[in-house]
Amino acid sequence: ADCVGDGQKCADWFGPYCCSGYYCSCRSMPYCRCRSDS
């Protein structure tokens, strides 16, 4: 279960998934990126 960290590209529907403590933000199109959820 690989995960990607802060600022890395992610796709919340099929992966790659963000590491624990991050969520996938798609506001900066065309890419989704992991942001800290704190």
Curated annotation (Swiss-Prot):
Disulfide cross-links: C3-C19, C10-C24, C18-C34, C26-C32
UniProt KW Transmembrane helix keyword: no
Organ and tissue specificity: Expressed by the venom gland.
Keywords from the UniProt entry: Amidation, Disulfide bond, Ion channel impairing toxin, Knottin, Neurotoxin, Secreted, Toxin, Voltage-gated sodium channel impairing toxin
A single GO molecular function term of this UniProt record: sodium channel regulator activity
Chief localisation class: secreted
Subcellular locations according to the entry: Secreted
Chain positions with Serine amide modification: S38
GO cellular component, one term: extracellular region
Transmembrane parts of this sequence: none
Function: Insecticidal neurotoxin that induces irreversible neuromuscular blockade in house crickets (A.domesticus). Modifies presynaptic voltage-gated sodium channels (Nav), causing them to open at the normal resting potential of the nerve. This leads to spontaneous release of neurotransmitter and repetitive action potentials in motor neurons.
Family the UniProt entry places it in: Belongs to the neurotoxin 07 (Beta/delta-agtx) family. 02 (aga-3) subfamily.
Domain notes: The presence of a 'disulfide through disulfide knot' structurally defines this protein as a knottin.
Protein name: Mu-agatoxin-Hc1c
